[in-house]
Swiss-Prot record:
HAMAP family hit by this protein: PEPCK_ATP (MF_00453)
Alphabetized UniProt keyword annotations: ATP-binding, Cytoplasm, Decarboxylase, Gluconeogenesis, Lyase, Manganese, Metal-binding, Nucleotide-binding
Localization annotation: Cytoplasm
Disulfide bonds listed in the record: none
Required co-factors: Mn(2+)
Pathway assigned in UniProt: Carbohydrate biosynthesis; gluconeogenesis
UniProt-recorded name of the protein: Phosphoenolpyruvate carboxykinase (ATP)
Entry annotated with the keyword Membrane: no
Cofactor comment: Binds 1 Mn(2+) ion per subunit.
Catalysed reaction equations from the record: oxaloacetate + ATP = phosphoenolpyruvate + ADP + CO2
Function statement: Involved in the gluconeogenesis. Catalyzes the conversion of oxaloacetate (OAA) to phosphoenolpyruvate (PEP) through direct phosphoryl transfer between the nucleoside triphosphate and OAA.
Gene3D superfamilies: 3.90.228.20, Phosphoenolpyruvate Carboxykinase, domain 1 (3.40.449.10), Phosphoenolpyruvate Carboxykinase, domain 2 (2.170.8.10)
Binding positions (Mn(2+)): K185, H204, D241
């Protein structure tokens, strides 16, 4: 379709999107065939530039604050028109995709991007249906115009870029953002608001299935191991980041994966390694003189990424869904070296740690956090993406866990034997051993040891994991230093949890001083 002197490219094939991106100088090819692009000064999400339109139909249901920032409806309309006019004056790309693999819960989305590579990214991460919108639902629009520059004084934005969600109009406006992760997380936020009304728990988690049909969920912030640990050659991948849990089903909200690439190796992450080929997008990955990706080079960012469709994963769930989970794993990257490699949680502890979302920002996906790592609490293991009050998601989680009798575990992928800079990080093989034990059922009914202060129960033995690692105090040379660190971490948990209005049973399930 042609408008004035420009062309609208609609539903191009992957091959054609790659060709357009190369012809327009948007990226180059790696030796694997993946398209390599740079995103400029924004190499992660920009949470200070994310807004939700404040309008009557949803205003009372949203937890407004520093994460969910209000944007005036009239300002949104003016800015949408301005960005759309800017985009319509030049070539752009349109694809029709779905968000949500379950037939009852998909959203039809018209995705419009200024660049070919961001359209390819959307085709990697969203679902490319055999038939678009068979149920005839109202369509969502994503308008992503990377080279538009917002003017805060005129547009009401925080900077030269913005991400704005309008639930009433079913629109997502992304302007001035070359980092493509904003697009997937915006639609995740949309589903995170909509799904609870349908009695579905939206989750920032990965999911996979065993040969026997058993499903495991991996909750966790970026860098804690969701993508790596769920990409298991012995199991079928459902997805690596965004899922819904309804009665009888866990389904992927997406159709692809968005893997961190820092220090990626074929040995430790063979599934991801093999998926980075023609049709995949590498963001902010440095190539050597032979067009070979140097995943150890962090000169552009520690948050280098690979986007690829699930079709690039040989062993996957064909329909992007599975049954309810036998095992629910909360991944935490503990910088203090206090938490054990695995703890077995009861329902109240599950609610406590889900609401707390304790972990570290590791090679953070957020702008302004720098390359360093620091401890953080992120409610629901994904606070930036959940528009409703946290308690609503926690109630749904407990309802689902009780309904299916799912077993819940807290797994530390962080430090042992001392805090960051003193101890060492658990190796991926060690953590994989913990995960394998959980998935085999070996920890159900296992004999446990109670850890005071942090108030957790740890198994006394885990197949293929060194027994001395299981009680973290034993891994510290200075036991008194461990006790001091444990009290310090408990204090952080207690202070963070003061903001939650929950039952005494849930409050008592956390660390105690």
């Amino acid at each position: 379709m042609t408008q004035a002197n420009n062309t609208v490219y609609t539903d191009l094939s992957v091959d054609d999107l790659v060709k357009e991106a190369l012809q327009r100088g948007e990226g180059v090819l790696a030796d694997t065939g993946a398209l390599v692009v740079e995103t400029g000064h924004r190499t992660g999400r920009s949470p200070a530039d994310r807004f939700i339109v404040d309008e009557p139909s949803t205003s009372a249901a949203i937890a407004w604050g520093p994460i969910n920032r209000k944007f005036p409806a009239d300002k949104f309309d003016a800015l949408w028109d301005r960005v759309e006019a800017f985009n319509n004056a030049q070539d752009h790309f349109v694809s029709y995709v779905h968000v949500g693999a379950a037939e009852e819960h998909y959203l039809p989305v018209k995705m419009t991007t200024q660049t070919a590579w961001q359209n390819l990214f959307g085709r990697c991460l969203f679902i490319n249906p055999a038939q678009y919108n068979p149920a005839g639902r109202d369509e969502w629009q994503v308008l992503n115009v990377a080279n538009f520059e917002c003017v805060p004084e005129r547009d009401g934005t925080n900077s030269d870029g913005c991400v704005i969600i309008n639930f009433a109009q079913k629109k997502v406006l992304i302007a001035g953002m070359r980092y493509a992760g904003e697009m997937k997380k915006a639609m995740f936020s949309v589903q995170n608001f909509l799904l609870p009304a349908a009695d579905v728990l939206p989750m920032h988690c990965a999911a996979n299935i065993g040969e026997a049909g058993d499903v495991t969920l991996f909750f966790g912030l970026s860098g804690t191991g969701k993508t790596t640990l769920s990409a298991d050659e012995s199991r079928y991948l459902i997805g690596d980041d965004e899922h819904g849990w309804g009665e009888g089903v866990v389904f992927n909200i997406e159709g692809g994966c968005y893997a961190k690439c820092i220090d990626l190796s074929e040995k430790n992450e063979p599934v991801i390694w093999k998926a980075i080929k023609h049709g995949a997008v590498l963001e902010n990955v440095v190539l050597d003189g032979n067009q070979h990706a140097d995943y150890a080079d962090v000169s552009l960012t520690q948050n280098s990424r690979a986007a690829y469709p699930l079709e690039h994963v040989a062993k996957r769930s064909e329909k992007n869904l599975g049954g309810e989970p036998n095992a629910v794993i909360f991944l935490t990257c503990d910088l203090t070296g206090v938490l054990p490699p695995v703890s077995i949680l009861n329902n109240e502890q599950a609610a406590y740690h889900f609401l707390s979302g304790y972990t570290a920002l590791v090679g953070s996906t957020e702008m302004g956090s720098g390359g360093g790592i620091k401890s953080t609490f992120s409610t629901c293991f994904g606070a930036p993406f959940f528009p409703r009050p946290a308690g609503e998601y926690a109630e749904l989680l407990i309802k689902r866990i009780k309904g299916f009798d799912s077993k819940v575990y807290l797994v530390n992928t962080g430090w042992t034997g001392g805090g960051y800079g003193v101890g060492k990080r658990f190796s991926i093989p060690t953590t994989r051993g913990v995960i394998a034990a959980i998935q085999s059922g070996a920890l159900i009914g296992a004999e446990t040891e109670h850890l005071d202060i942090i108030n957790l129960d740890v198994p006394k033995a885990v197949p293929s994991v060194e027994t001395e690692l299981l009680n973290p105090r034993n891994t510290w040379a200075d036991k008194a230093a461990y006790d001091t660190a444990a009290k310090g971490l408990a204090g952080l948990f207690i202070e963070n949890f003061k903001k939650f209005d929950v039952s005494d049973a849930i409050k008592a399930a956390g660390p105690q001083l």
